[in-house]
Amino acid sequence: MNTESLVAALSQNNVKLARTLLLANLLEETQGKNSWDCPHYTADRAVQESIALCEANNDRMTYFGLENLRDRYFLRDANDAICENPQTFFARVATGMARGDRAFAQELYDYMSKGWFIPATPVLMNIGTSKGLCISCFLNTVPDTLEGIFDIYRENAFLAKFGGGIGTDWSQLRGQNAPLKSSGLRSSGVIPFLKIMDSETLAISRNSHRRGAAAAYLRIDHPDIEDFLEIRKPTGGDMDRKCLNINHGVVITDAFMEAVEARQPYKLVCPHTGTITKELDAMEIWRKLLTMRAETGEPYFLYIDTVNRSIPPHHKELRLLVRQSNLCTEIVLPTTNDRTA
């Protein structure tokens, strides 16, 4: 492809011409190549070769779709050159998902190639390879021990490295200035540990295509909730207590919302001892929540009692509880100190 021609087409807002030029370049660049030229390829080559490709479906692709696939998703060979084009890419993903079923692989390919269906990003990037996970979201909870906290840091680092978005519940940690029996000192609270999570998230690149992403969750009745609400606010306060690289969500209880409706105070409770540490004006905290949402788009809201009333019977029989949600607050699964969902 003539790069000058592509630049000229884009500068003239001729996106259709730019798409044609980009597609021609991709097909020329990958001529004689296929997914299995990637050293990480692990899919069933025989199944992939059996898929009947429809090159005419390339015309369904937009310029921006092609550019995104080329930049993020197509596999590369040992020389870091692209070895997939749109149709071989869809065939590789379909093969990985079909697990040896040729008819199903063909059906999946047809759906994706026609634009009827597309899997999540980790599937597109990793399936049929040894590069990473095909799971988008993970949920875990942090125990109130130093060992447990740093175990979570390690787990989150590898989950982010291999393509996962993470939702971590920090509500078990005792609040700031709570006594520590083992040392006779007092706890630094949740926020300094979130600062480490914030730096870790910035440092870990998710599959080298985008930064690792994580959300921290804290109960509305946690002693550190007031500071937690402001960790994403870029102005005011101590920057050592800001966490601008992670998302955050508040786990809201029925008791809090009832206090808001009744214009009454509500209690902050130490998760370690169960003692009441403070009372706050529920309506003022609710206003602060809404103000932060208006200013920063966060925190997320998770109405935890509503969720736990609706969990499946087999979870209830095992006495499992949902503590938080995932990075995007659309998945709710039970977690424990030794169970990552």
Task: Annotate each PLM feature.
Residues 1-341:
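Extended catalytic cores of very large enzyme megasubunits
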